Amino acid sequence: MASLLGVLCGWGTRPEEQQYEMIRAAAPPSEAEPRLQEALAVVNALLPAPITLDDALESLDDTRRLVKARALARTYHACMVNLERLARHHPGLEGSTIDGAVAAHRDKMRRLADTCMATILQMYMSVGAADKSADVLVSQAIRSMAESDVVMEDVAIAERALGLSTSALAGGTRTAGLGATEAPPGPTRAQAPEVASVPVTHAGDRSPVRPGPVPPADPTPDPRHRTSAPKRQASSTEAPLLLA
């Protein structure tokens, strides 16, 4: 009877209430926070209005946009470094054989840097930043960077343009610095005695005009041996006269 009254009056056991967790604000994982901060620093250096970490983590699309902008910003900085190095090359003064390659790479770097900058500004500053055109531009820029081996190729050309390579350039000159070339080395010391020894060997057959130091080893015969030869001939002619 009591149980019946309890059921009718609602005195029975109540079901447990559901537990709800508070939704926290978007926060990056602890291992990914340094990379996101570095990406923000690189991207904000190119944006007129900087963005915050909360703006980047507001949605998944914004996070992906930050990752793509970071790749574009790194590509942009690599292009600017290569342009700065290639600008030190003076056409016609040092290694004329690489003037065409330097000019071609300079145009390619400038075009790629402008593409990266325009894409970053479109992703964050334009109204229609959520369309797929930004993804296409990002893919094209990254593909262009990978296919042409811009980093390795431009470093090699910049080293040759700045004279950092030890190999000699065409024309027999070696680049010594920015806009200066070093002439080929002159005759060494070992070649000078050979030129001076030619008249010495020919002049040994005749008596010198003025006294000078006698060389230690003279290949010419001694003059005393030449004077003794007529004496031996004279003694041979006098021998028959004495016998007669």
From Swiss-Prot:
Main localization (coarse): virion
Domain of life: Viruses
Protein keywords: Host cytoplasm, Host Golgi apparatus, Lipoprotein, Palmitate, Phosphoprotein, Virion, Virion tegument
Physiological role: Plays several roles during the time course of infection, including egress of virus particles from the perinuclear space and secondary envelopment of cytoplasmic capsids that bud into specific trans-Golgi network (TGN)-derived membranes.
Record organism: Human herpesvirus 2 (strain HG52)
Region of interest: Disordered: 175-244
PTM summary: Phosphorylated.
Subcellular location: Virion tegument; Host cytoplasm; Host Golgi apparatus
UniProt biased composition (Pro residues): 210-220
Family according to the record: Belongs to the herpesviridae UL51 family.
Residue positions bearing lipid (S-palmitoyl cysteine): 9
GO cellular component: host cell Golgi apparatus; viral tegument
Keyword Transmembrane among UniProt keywords: no
Quaternary data: Oligomerizes. Interacts with UL7; this interaction mediates UL7 incorporation to virions.
Pfam families from the UniProt entry: Herpes_UL51
Record's protein name: Tegument protein UL51
